[in-house]
Design a protein with these regions (language model features):
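N-terminal substrate-binding region of glycoside hydrolase catalytic domains
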Residues: 23-100, 106-135, 141, 157, ...
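Aromatic-rich peripheral "rim/lid" segments of glycoside hydrolase catalytic domains that contact
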Residues: 41-47, 261, 280-296, 300-353
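Structural preference for beta-strand elements that scaffold enzyme active sites
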Residues: 28-30, 67-70, 100-102, 152-157, ...
Length: 353
């Protein structure tokens, strides 16, 4: 068993520039960087492990094999954060670096997740038919802006962590399952109208919970919803907070098993579109475990899913500890990558012995 001290020595001796040799397969390593614009506007500067100031996206791309970014987009956000213009600007930066783009439609003016799926203010009081039109027009408007500026997303999410539906209560999955599926279909059709080759993703949380995926996706299929790919969130940290009896290893194993199950049952590819691990600068052993777990997830998602998992995205790796009260980023308080980021590097993605 490799000791913790030897693990750290191996990590610090690793020259990140070696990561520039990309894998030959089509497996994607990605990063959701929705906070990045706001961070840069607030003066946050990023550095590599040697202390050299670097552009954040360039650092992710060249040192850690991050080949794609994921960007959320809100309908009418207060202050303009995460709007279509910010999406376009980040899309241009990614394209200049040869990175691919995933667009994550929240269909809300702010955060949408399993605990909240608020209807945008401008859509309030609309009928189901009108709200489907709203969703369709918003999707087409955002994607057309990208297309007119030469940006082509490879993947588009129609909703964010829609385990319980979206646009509540109109599209709540328990109260109105048919309408939930109708919104998914409206989003799918809108994406295909602008970008026929884009892969449309239905995204759910708790990737380790097979029963959730069976229940939700069966409803989507039953009532005419369509998707090309299933996106999963995988957060051992949050799963263990909610269920202390669980452990990270079993959660990861259950997710890998669920990827195989979902791909077989629904005949589609799968991606882990969100994951993250605790950054605790006072306890480096916590971050070392995060490195091991991220490396394991990437390794097994690529090698042990019958070729059906197409990638892993880290949610806000460039997030400094405590930014927006979040502690699952992978950079330290000085804006430099922690050991967690080494999970992306092929040379360190072998089982520790």
């Amino acid at each position: 068993m490799m000791t913790f001290r030897l693990m750290l020595l191996a990590a610090t001796m690793m020259v990140p520039r070696m990561a520039q040799s990309q894998t030959n397969d089509d497996f994607v390593k990605g990063a959701d960087v929705g906070f990045l614009t706001a961070q840069e506007q607030r003066g946050v500067r990023f550095h590599d492990r040697e202390g050299h100031e670097r552009d954040c996206l360039e650092l992710l791309r060249n040192d850690y094999q991050i080949g794609a970014i994921r960007m959320r987009v809100w309908v009418d956000p207060r202050g303009g954060s995460c709007d279509k213009h910010e999406l376009l600007a980040m899309g241009r930066r990614a394209k200049a670096l040869g990175m691919q783009l995933m667009v994550d439609f929240h269909y809300a003016d702010s955060w949408a997740d399993p605990s909240q799926q608020p209807i945008p203010a401008a859509w309030q009081g609309h009928s189901f038919k009108q709200m489907k039109r709203d969703l369709r027009e918003h999707t087409i408007d955002v994607l057309t802006l990208l297309k007119e500026n030469g940006i082509t997303p490879r993947w588009v999410q129609v909703g964010n962590e829609t385990a319980n539906g979206l646009l509540w209560p109109m599209g709540h999955i328990k109260e109105n399952p048919r309408q939930y599926a109708g919104f998914i279909r409206a989003g799918y059709d809108a994406v295909k109208k602008v970008f026929p080759e884009a892969l449309v993703i239905v995204h759910l949380d708790r990737g380790h919970k097979q029963s959730l995926y069976d229940w939700n996706l069966d409803i989507v299929k039953k009532y005419g919803g369509r998707f090309d790919m299933v996106g999963m969130s995988l957060y051992p940290y949050w799963a263990m907070r909610d269920h202390p009896e669980l452990d990270a290893d079993s959660i990861i194993s259950d997710c890998i098993r669920n990827i195989r199950h979902v791909s077989r049952k629904y005949g589609c590819d799968v991606m882990i579109v969100e994951t993250g691990f605790e950054t605790n600068e006072e306890h480096p052993e916590v971050m070392a475990r995060g490195w091991q777990q991220l490396a394991r997830i990437i390794r097994e998602a690529r090698n042990d899913t019958e070729g059906r998992c197409r990638g892993v995205f880290y949610w806000e790796p460039q997030c400094l500890p405590g930014y927006h009260h979040y502690h699952l980023g992978a950079f330290d308080s000085k804006g430099a990558p922690t050991i967690i980021m080494n999970g992306f590097i092929d040379a360190l993605m072998q089982p520790l012995r």
